[in-house]
Swiss-Prot record:
Residues covered by the VP35 IID domain: 204-329
Name of the gene: VP35
Organism of derivation: Lake Victoria marburgvirus (strain Popp-67) (MARV)
Role according to the record: Plays an essential role in viral RNA synthesis and also a role in suppressing innate immune signaling.
Domain of life from the UniProt record: Viruses
Keyword Coiled coil found: yes
Compartments, as annotated in UniProt: Virion; Host cytoplasm
Stated family: Belongs to the filoviridae polymerase cofactor VP35 family.
Upper classification of the organism: Viruses, Riboviria, Orthornavirae, Negarnaviricota, Haploviricotina
Keywords: Coiled coil, Host cytoplasm, Transcription, Viral RNA replication, Virion
Protein name from the UniProt record: Polymerase cofactor VP35
InterPro entries recorded: Filo_VP35, VP35_IID, VP35_IID_b-sht, VP35_IID_hlx
Coiled coil ranges: 70-120
GO CC terms in record: host cell cytoplasm; virion component
Length: 329
């Protein structure tokens, strides 16, 4: 331990000059003070070669890490720029999507109205087609059969106005033997036999004649005597013979309601309707090919080995010279 009295004497000696400074601190008192205050591990400590090599390798690692960080920073700069561009593009796309959604909400009522109009148009076309084939009569068409028979028995002649209805009494009078019936009654019975009895099936799909069906199709076709007019006649005749004229007309109107034109509807039906699959086209005899309608002359082709309607062959023209040409659509 330090002696406090001794240290006090030394301090007093130094302050009064009785004790020289060199005697206490040596020749260079600041050298010991410098050495005492000098931090450890700078010059006083010598590093071994092993530690020096480790320090050098650590510096290299730190330098490599700095280079890697700088490289990564250089790479991240364009990536950040691209991400910002993508973000701005996404914002624009989101804005446009919201705008489209708003427009769709505005268009929805118009689309519903379009579907309603399409359904109304389809229903009206079917009603018009059926209306053309309903029996239209005037006069006493609502008179009951009893009133008709009473008038006939009283006056001996039927009512002056036409009365077309299904009356068993008139039919029996017209067909019974030994009964003299007036010509008017006979005509009424003939008309009644020709009237199509309306039912749920016959009203929805009336069995039209080939001529009436072709005339209906002609109203949708532009021009005259085109290959599609010939196709309409051929398809109408085949549909009538197969008893599917009503179904064919309904399918035709269905395709028209989808937005197709009459030519496309006839072409599709000729290749998909079951009554036309595998059917051989009819042979039409002509004097020469100059008598073929002019719009059809450019569509004449050589007759293939097995022509069918579902493959686009409408008919085959045969001239008096024995030559044949097929009409192709």
């Amino acid at each position: 331990m330090w002696d406090s009295s001794y240290m006090q004497q030394v301090s007093e000696g130094l302050m009064t000059g009785k004790v020289p400074i060199d005697q206490v601190f040596g020749a260079n008192p600041s050298e010991k003070l410098h050495k005492r205050r000098k931090p450890k591990g700078t010059v006083g400590l010598q590093c071994s070669p092993c530690l020096m090599s480790k320090a050098t390798s650590t510096d290299d690692i730190v330098w490599d890490q700095l280079i890697v960080k700088k490289t990564l920073a250089d790479l991240l700069i364009p990536i950040n720029r691209q991400i910002s561009d993508i973000q701005s593009t996404l914002n624009e796309v989101t804005t446009r999507v919201h705008e489209i959604e708003r427009q769709l909400h505005e268009i929805t009522p118009v689309l519903k109205m379009g579907r309603t109009l399409e359904a109304i148009s389809k229903g009206m076309s079917e009603m018009l087609a059926k209306y053309d084939h309903l029996v239209i009569s005037t006069g006493r068409t609502t008179a009951p059969a009893a009133a008709f028979d009473a008038y006939l028995n009283e006056h001996g002649v039927p009512p002056p106005q036409p009365a077309i209805f299904k009356d068993l009494g008139v039919a029996q009078q017209a067909c019974s033997k030994g009964t003299m019936v007036k010509n008017e009654t006979t005509d009424a019975a003939d008309k009644m036999s020709k009237v199509l009895e309306l039912s749920e099936e016959t009203f929805s799909k009336p069995n039209l004649s080939a001529k009436d069906l072709a005339l209906l199709l002609f109203t949708h076709l532009p021009g005259n005597n085109t290959p599609f007019h010939i196709l309409a006649q051929v398809l109408s005749k085949i549909a009538y013979k197969s008893g599917k004229s009503g179904a064919f007309l309904d399918a035709f109107h269905q395709i028209l309601s989808e937005g197709e034109n009459a030519q496309a509807a006839l072409t599709r039906l000729s290749r998909t309707f079951d009554a036309f699959l595998g059917v051989v086209p009819p042979v039409i005899r002509v004097k020469n090919f100059q008598t073929v309608p002019r719009p059809c002359q450019k569509s004449l082709r050589a007759v293939p080995p097995n022509p069918t309607i579902d493959k686009g062959w409408v008919c085959v023209y045969s001239s008096e010279q024995g030559e044949t040409r097929a009409l192709k659509i």
